[in-house]
Amino acid sequence: MTPLAQRLAPRRGWACVALFCLLLILFGTLSPGEPHPEQTFPWDKLQHFSAFALLALTTRLAGLSSLVILPALLLLGVGIEGLQLVIPYRGAEVLDALADFLGILAGLGCHLGGRLMVRLSRL
């Protein structure tokens, strides 16, 4: 295996994980919902936050720039909310898009924090 191929191999693996995360998000958010009672804890917002944090982190580990990831995933989150308007028992919520955005920032922040820790450990 060439040195370049060795460097890119982990990124391909993370790209596969990111694609899997994306497919799970699309399936989970665009499948028709079921009526359910109001919840006292906002599990839905936590799910949005977690899913987009993981997607942002894995796409960053796959080698995409934060400057590409942030607007792309933000558009994805807003687009999903728009599509949910026409899906039975789904609805668009501004707070869902906000949870997506905060999750994206958290995922990118985790990547940045990890890189800083590695650099500091080399001092």
Predicted regions and their residues:
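Membrane-interfacial alpha-helical segments at the cytosolic side of multi-pass membrane proteins
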Residues: 50-66, 104-114
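Residue-level signature of the transmembrane alpha-helical core
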Residues: 54, 70-78, 97, 101, ...
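Aromatic-anchored segments of alpha-helical transmembrane domains
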Residues: 23-32, 75-85
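"…centered on the first transmembrane helix and the immediately adjacent amphipathic helix/loop
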Residues: 1-59
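Short helix-capping/hinge motifs at transmembrane helix termini and TM-loop junctions
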Residues: 31-32, 64, 88-89, 115
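Interfacial helix-loop-helix junctions of multi-pass membrane proteins
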Residues: 34-45, 82-98, 102
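Short, charged juxtamembrane terminal tails flanking transmembrane helices
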Residues: 118-123
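Membrane-helix interface segments
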Residues: 12-13, 62-70, 93-94
